[in-house]
Amino acid sequence: MGRDKKERYITMEKKLVIACDHGGYELKLALISHLSESGYTVVDLGCDSPESVDYPVYADKLCCALNRGDAPLGILVCGTGLGMSIAANKHKGIRAVCCSDTFSAKMGRVHNNANVLCMGGRVVDAERGCALADAFLQAEFEGGRHERRVVMLNALDEAK
């Protein structure tokens, strides 16, 4: 791999997009701080205050950024993580997992090749949220028998 390609690969691996609604605003700020300190380039797609907003708008912004190739992975935060997960999974090519434990966050990447982690600002505190993000971002897709299953999931996108 040439130097430029290797540098771009490393840069993209440490880059992610993040978005939230009002229910996830405080947790999003904690995640950005933690991940930036951990060496990630974090692109914040909003929301920008704890004022009430509609979560599908921010899920859409993040999923469109991923599908454009702006970053390989994303994190969405709302009150429970559920609404963001539902909205994100409406997008072709997105495999979003809603997690409140580190094992599920890790396995979402390892077995399902998830590209979006969703969590709830009213479900997990900042410490747990940061641990979820670390587990998700440090895990790698295992491939093998799981690759076949991800191909099946991708085929469902095409069937729509």
What residue spans do the PLM features occupy?
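Short, Lys/Arg-enriched N-terminal segments with co-localized hydrophobic residues
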Residues: G2-T11
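Phosphate-coordination loops involved in phosphoryl transfer and adenosine-cofactor binding
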Residues: E13, A71, N113
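C-terminal binding/interaction regions
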Residues: V17-A19, G23-G24, T102-K160
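Glycine-rich phosphate/diphosphate-binding loop of Rossmann-like nucleotide-binding domains
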Residues: V17-E37
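Short hydrophobic/aromatic-enriched beta-strand-loop microsegments
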Residues: T41, I94-D101
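A short beta-strand-loop structural module common to alpha/beta enzyme folds
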Residues: T41-S52
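Helix-adjacent hinge/juxtasegments
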Residues: Y58-V97
